């Protein structure tokens, strides 16, 4: 699911841009997309039609660097790269990746949430400065769309239950491609310790929602029912009529690792716990763009189940990292733009008005 594209299209639909523009969403999952958008949005999944509309549309929004049809924008067309997060791992130029195309040639405008984030984009992809749009990601508008009480009701939890959302980054493919034998299937959790984690969470009246990466290899314990651990995928969120970011906005804390979602979560200034059990192997195999940042993360770190539960309990009891989160947020997200106005700001910077 391309969350920035969805947030942009949702804002456009809600604000009557459909009266001025035909809105088309290309996807390989039209059934799920149909649930998310009104009938005024045309949903297509045929690749030939998708390529035709990419070539013939005035504005094209993409979220991946290697989307299906890479080519120069057509005459008077704007190809807008929204990105799916500020790179943390070495990618593009820093990963010695080569393509038949130039990154700078195929995009008319490129989104970055801050000037510092833009400097990372330039290192990775050699984008020209005149293509930048500085604005936090439109998907972050959804952080305001769900309150905690409603989320607990949807999940069947009591009013006093604390909710942590766990978003592990994807690991396996990179490790396998690069011949590493120490690839974890999943950070910290195994079939041998997941019941221990569940028991410790139950004692502290905390429920952890694990949102699995779309490419995560499915493990046996994902399909087991636990009292205080819930595994979710994109389909489950669609069925609940929720987005990942509305789920994050209603949570009490985030658990993550080497994922750019941590920069988005800074906008709500809630605690973050970092799982770092494979930090050194991940660093050696993948590499970090800003290693110092991960030596000074704004939250406690956990190497095992016991440390994870203790870290969650500590940040939900006494938040000792608020100042550090605020400092990092100012670095990673442009302050002057109000949360809830990000999609609108991107449209305005492109000259698209209601």
Locate predicted features:
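Donor nucleotide-activated moiety binding/catalytic core segment of transferases
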Residues: 43-57, 215-260
